[in-house]
Amino acid sequence: MTKYIFVTGGVVSSIGKGIVAASLGRLLKNRGLKVTIQKFDPYINIDPGTMSPYQHGEVYVTDDGAETDLDLGHYERFIDINLNKYSNVTTGKIYSEVLRKERKGEYLGATVQVIPHITDALKEKIKRAASTTDSDVIITEVGGTVGDIESLPFLEALRQMKADVGSENVMYIHTTLLPYLKAAGEMKTKPTQHSVKELRGLGIQPNMLVIRTEEPVEQGIKNKLAQFCDVNSEAVIESRDVEHLYQIPLNLQAQSMDQIVCDHLKLNAPQADMTEWSAMVDKVMNLRKTTKIALVGKYVELPDAYLSVVEALKHSGYANDTAIDLKWVNANDVTVDNAADLLGDADGIIVPGGFGQRGTEGKIQAIRYARENDVPMLGICLGMQLTCVEFARHVLNMEGANSFELEPSTKYPIIDIMRDQIDIEDMGGTLRLGLYPCKLKPGSKAAMAYNNQEVVQRRHRHRYEFNNKFRPEFEAAGFVFSGVSPDNRLVEIVELKEKKFFVAAQYHPELQSRPNRPEELYTAFVTAAIKNSN
């Protein structure tokens, strides 16, 4: 029988529910249990694919092409699993499916209501996420805060699950903030008490509290919370601020969180062996070198827009015993005249993805600086496309060369819309999304990065591709197409072989990086940057 764990949040948003859920998932996985995890997002968008990065942060893409919340990146990196489209559910997605069924007459004339139709659809998503992965345990995080009007149908579905599958198969974990008033010198439990009271008013009694705090929590405070919130005192778990996120699973294990969960759900599983994880954390805490990487992006005011990129750089740094000193460079600020001032102290330059015209000329100048000064450079998605545009303009002398996306009237559309995208008008969910194969050119830097594999599978999110009619001119000038689709139609990786490292990929390699298994192309880039710093 599958066990269901539901993680809710109270008092304030952005309290770290996703990290708690991911950390618990890692602990349960290391007990030998098969774990999956999902995120419920109460917003009305179908998915975050068309949302501004300033609103939502990065869009995380799964193997099967779902555009999802960035928390799924935390889940995959912590638990080291590949999630699917059932792992992110929004209000918009649920209502869209229910209304589509109503239009088809599938409800046989019934009045369609929040209860039972919306709540039934939500419960079906929970069960489908578990069944499609054959999991022993599924962890479901509900976004937002208890008390938000948008969350009510989600919480009602969670309440009903207890009756549907039995109380011994369900556990409710509530994460809250325990504020510390410096002037008074004391922690305040009242916000947590009120949050739990509101949750109980919706029919959910939490079995565990995870309290986010900046200061150590005395046992007396835990006992008080246990008494007023009706949970066992040992089930009041402290989640203190840490230097590195990957410390959190170890901190939670030290408080027997996973054992309490297993006892409640009657899961007979051995103790979690966290030896490898602990060694990784110890290494992360004691890195001996530092390498400066300049990230040239459009959305640098909100680092969450590049969360997976940053994590992938860190992972590759760990593998090289190196801390990454990230220099955020706004692409709008980069010009041919100041590129050296902005980028001259960087050991490597990364140009990540994005959409739209703004900042693209700055990215092109950053790429030009890297090429002309032989600074290791990694381009991702739009960064790959602009790498091709930069080469066309400044090496092949194609004045005005551009991407058709950015300038439809350009004489040299180096990047063009994919053939199967021409007649598509909707923006959401219509990109080339998910896992696709990439055939590597033997002897190339890309092939060497991937240990001379013939084919790698990587995740994509794009609508435009390199225009193949320009391939002969590029190749004649030494531009290497080192990764292509198996049918040779789509360009996946480009590089300049004579440079220290000048490689750009159409796909998003960062989405498959893990703290104990860094993505190979990122590792090759970071390794080249380290050599460049010596």
UniProtKB/Swiss-Prot annotation:
PROSITE patterns: GATASE_TYPE_1
Reaction catalyzed: UTP + L-glutamine + ATP + H2O = CTP + L-glutamate + ADP + phosphate + 2 H(+); L-glutamine + H2O = L-glutamate + NH4(+); UTP + NH4(+) + ATP = CTP + ADP + phosphate + 2 H(+)
Binding positions (ATP): 14-19, 71, 240-242
Domain Glutamine amidotransferase type-1: 292-534
Annotated region (Amidoligase domain), positions in chain: 1-267
Listed EC numbers: 6.3.4.2
Residue sites binding UTP per the record: 13, 188-193, 224
Enzyme active site: 381, 508, 510
UniProt pathway: Pyrimidine metabolism; CTP biosynthesis via de novo pathway; CTP from UDP: step 2/2
Listed CDD domains: CTPS_N (cd03113), GATase1_CTP_Synthase (cd01746)
GO biological processes: 'de novo' CTP biosynthetic process; pyrimidine nucleobase biosynthetic process
Residues annotated for L-glutamine binding in this entry: 54, 354, 382-385, 405, 463
Any one GO molecular function term: glutaminase activity
Residues annotated as binding Mg(2+): 71, 141
Binding of CTP, residues: 13, 148-150, 188-193, 224
Activity regulation behaviour: Allosterically activated by GTP, when glutamine is the substrate; GTP has no effect on the reaction when ammonia is the substrate. The allosteric effector GTP functions by stabilizing the protein conformation that binds the tetrahedral intermediate(s) formed during glutamine hydrolysis. Inhibited by the product CTP, via allosteric rather than competitive inhibition.
GO cellular component, as recorded: cytosol
InterPro entries for this protein: Class_I_gatase-like, CTP_synthase, CTP_synthase_N, GATASE, GATase1_CTP_Synthase, P-loop_NTPase
This protein's UniProt keywords: ATP-binding, Glutamine amidotransferase, Ligase, Magnesium, Metal-binding, Nucleotide-binding, Pyrimidine biosynthesis
First-tier enzyme category under EC: ligase
Family per record: Belongs to the CTP synthase family.
Anything else known: CTPSs have evolved a hybrid strategy for distinguishing between UTP and CTP. The overlapping regions of the product feedback inhibitory and substrate sites recognize a common feature in both compounds, the triphosphate moiety. To differentiate isosteric substrate and product pyrimidine rings, an additional pocket far from the expected kinase/ligase catalytic site, specifically recognizes the cytosine and ribose portions of the product inhibitor.
Quaternary context: Homotetramer.
PANTHER family documented for this protein: CTP SYNTHASE (PTHR11550), CTP SYNTHASE-RELATED (PTHR11550:SF0)
Its biological purpose: Catalyzes the ATP-dependent amination of UTP to CTP with either L-glutamine or ammonia as the source of nitrogen. Regulates intracellular CTP levels through interactions with the four ribonucleotide triphosphates.
Annotated protein name in UniProt: CTP synthase
